């Protein structure tokens, strides 16, 4: 038999050591080296562990499964809350008032809907809540107050100022005026002069329209209804148009301002028409 080479000797020695370690000799040798043969610490060598422990179960795959199931259960939970809210709304008229400590499901749902994104993709959180619809009886009462204000304004202007003033400038020497002592005073003399008609009429219209506007604000404060924002159909139609469709900034506010000026201008046009008609009648009579 030929002698073994150095490489073969080292290989045989390595194989014997490996076989010895696989039979449990690694732990006893480790205890001898470290002097912990009688210690209670775990001194088991990793070489003694079975090779089957190398395969670990795919725990990461199963750990993500509950999250997917949890997301799929969100919609049924919302439906359940809505059903409970509907049952609560039906039972409010039959049951006693609930305790203040009990959470209101309707308030909970409204707060959840507030944080949800709108149809345009932007979150609706922080947006102003839509105004409650105005009672029809309140609208009728507001229209009644507004019509009464306009009627009294026109009556006072026409009967107590415009008609007497137009009669004065067209009949300055009438026998009616000497019966009143104030018509003979010095401050009344400019009213008799027809050349002052434009200045006097413009001053009167400015004062009367200013007073009417203030009284209109008092009517809005009394009825809690804004004259144009809540009653005008054109303003309601413009408010339905989304922002950006029409390239005009604050279209609703500008329309309200324009309608306010038109309301005052229409009163001025009405008074001018009345003056022209009365002047024509007094001139040819």
Swiss-Prot record:
Region (Disordered): 1-71
Membrane-topology descriptor: Multi-pass membrane protein
Parts of the chain that traverse the membrane: 149-169, 197-216, 264-284
One cellular-component annotation, GO: Golgi membrane
UniProt keyword list: Acetylation, Endoplasmic reticulum, ER-Golgi transport, Glycoprotein, Golgi apparatus, Membrane, Phosphoprotein, Transmembrane, Transmembrane helix, Transport
Record: glycosylation sites: 173, 196
Segments on the Lumenal side according to the record's topology features: 170-196, 285
Location(s) in or outside the cell: Endoplasmic reticulum membrane; Golgi apparatus membrane
UniProt GO BP: protein insertion into ER membrane; retrograde vesicle-mediated transport, Golgi to endoplasmic reticulum
Record-listed N-acetylserine modification sites: 2
Composition skew (Low complexity), residue ranges: 49-60
Post-translational modification Phosphoserine, affected residues: 45
PANTHER family in the cross-refs: GOLGI TO ER TRAFFIC PROTEIN 2
Family to which this protein belongs: Belongs to the GET2 family.
Quaternary structure annotation from Swiss-Prot or TrEMBL: Component of the Golgi to ER traffic (GET) complex, which is composed of GET1, GET2 and GET3. Within the complex, GET1 and GET2 form a heterotetramer which is stabilized by phosphatidylinositol binding and which binds to the GET3 homodimer.
Designated name of the protein: Golgi to ER traffic protein 2
Organism of provenance: Saccharomyces cerevisiae (strain YJM789) (Baker's yeast)
């Amino acid at each position: 038999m030929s002698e073994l080479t150095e490489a073969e000797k080292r290989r045989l020695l390595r194989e014997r050591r490996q076989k010895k370690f696989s039979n449990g000799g690694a732990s006893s040798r480790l205890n001898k080296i470290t002097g912990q043969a009688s210690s209670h610490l775990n001194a088991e060598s990793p070489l003694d562990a079975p090779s089957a422990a190398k395969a670990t179960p795919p725990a990461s795959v199963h750990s993500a499964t509950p999250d997917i199931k949890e997301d799929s259960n969100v919609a049924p939970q919302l439906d359940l809350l809505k059903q409970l809210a509907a049952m609560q709304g039906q039972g409010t008229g039959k049951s006693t008032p609930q305790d203040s400590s009990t959470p209101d499901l309707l308030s909970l749902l409204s707060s959840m809907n507030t944080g949800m994104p709108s149809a345009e993709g932007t979150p609706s959180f922080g947006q102003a809540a839509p105004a409650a619809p105005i009672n029809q009886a309140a609208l009728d009462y507001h229209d009644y107050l507004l019509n009464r204000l306009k009627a009294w304004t026109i009556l006072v202007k026409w009967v107590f100022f415009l008609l007497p003033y137009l009669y004065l400038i067209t009949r300055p020497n009438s026998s009616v005026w000497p019966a009143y002592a104030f018509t003979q005073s010095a401050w009344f003399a400019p009213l008799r002069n027809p050349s002052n008609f434009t200045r006097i009429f413009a001053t009167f219209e400015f004062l009367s329209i200013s007073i009417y506007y203030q009284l209109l604000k008092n009517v809005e404060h009394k009825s809690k209804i804004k004259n144009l924002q809540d009653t005008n159909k054109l303003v309601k139609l413009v408010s339905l148009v989304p922002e950006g469709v029409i390239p005009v900034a604050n279209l609703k506010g500008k329309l309200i301002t324009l309608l306010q000026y038109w309301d005052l201008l229409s009163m001025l046009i009405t008074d001018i028409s009345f003056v022209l008609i009365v002047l024509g009648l007094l001139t040819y009579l």
